[in-house]
Design a protein with these regions (language model features):
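Walker A/P-loop
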Residues: 61, 243-267, 272
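PLD/PLD-like phosphodiesterase catalytic module centered on the HKD motif
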Residues: 1-244, 274
Length: 277
């Protein structure tokens, strides 16, 4: 690394962590990355900028949707033309990532896509990290933003952009962690996960649509009423209790009736403890 680059990095660290009044080159300064419409700031703008400047990139996020990758596709296709390699790791966590979005990424010749199987690994996976390397410098965005439209453009998201040499401890630990996840036996290549994941995704999608469409049943609408046999039992039960008896026997043809009768054996009592078993 040149002395000039090292000096600019030190100045950037000073501005970010010691004295905000010190002038520094923005390219070497750690930063808070968020969506702020009033100031015209968007997470996606920072990611696009870093993608266009890097020599290689790695991304690890829990969720990827079409709304998230669509505005990035032009940039990613430009990187494809320039043969800038990228690795993207996502998950089947909550079956939220959209198969269409994953297929779009797979179609890029410069991008290798993997999915971490949280079910087989028996652990959650909620990382949101974007690693960009140019020459000997890493610029890493870590925080709360998945690759979804809302997360990259309008949600309240908190991310930190780290700038480090490749020998920097934090950068080394983050890159090491990424490679450990990427090389894990639970990280599956596209051809090994896509069809199975797509089937599960479509099933769950239909279930969600049905759940949204069907109204919640009203307890008033479906209020249970005793049938004639049960009414007779309740009447006789009251007589037995009023006579001071504490035992009775009901023989019913079906278990359902027994359950309903049991639920209605205390009519008129304000407390269950006042009735007998």
């Amino acid at each position: 690394m040149s002395n000039t680059a090292l000096t600019q990095l030190q100045e950037g660290l000073t501005t970010a962590y010691i004295d905000g009044t010190v002038a520094a080159n923005l390219a070497y300064k750690p930063a808070f990355v968020s969506n702020n419409p009033e100031e015209g700031k968007k997470v996606i703008s920072v990611i696009e900028d870093e993608l266009m400047k890097c020599d290689q990139f790695q991304i690890s996020v829990a969720f990827i949707t079409m709304g998230g990758i669509t505005p990035l596709l032009q940039t990613l296709k430009e990187l494809e033309k320039r043969q800038i390699p990228g690795q993207i790791l996502t998950t089947n966590y909550l079956n939220f990532s959209e198969p269409r979005a994953l297929k779009k990424l797979q179609e890029l010749s410069n991008v290798t896509l993997k999915m971490y199987d949280v079910d087989r690994a028996d652990q959650g996976f909620h990382t949101k990290g974007y690693i960009f390397k140019k020459e000997e410098i890493y610029r890493i965005i870590i925080g709360s933003s998945n690759i979804t439209s809302a997360a990259l453009t309008k949600n309240k998201e908190w991310n930190t952009k780290i700038v480090s040499t490749e020998q920097g401890e934090i950068a080394m630990e983050i890159v090491k962690e990424f490679h450990q996840l990427w090389d894990s036996k639970y990280a599956l290549f596209y051809d090994d996960f896509y069809e199975n994941y797509k089937q599960k995704y479509e099933i769950i999608k239909k279930q969600r649509e049905i759940a949204k469409r069907d109204e919640i049943a009203s307890t008033e609408k479906y209020k249970l009423e005793p049938n004639s046999m049960q009414v007779g039992f309740i009447t006789n039960l009251r007589r037995i209790v009023d006579a001071g008896e504490n035992r009775a026997l009901l023989i019913s043809a079906t278990g359902e009736r027994g359950i309903f009768v049991t639920g209605g054996r205390n009519p008129g009592f304000t407390r269950v403890s006042e009735a007998w078993s």
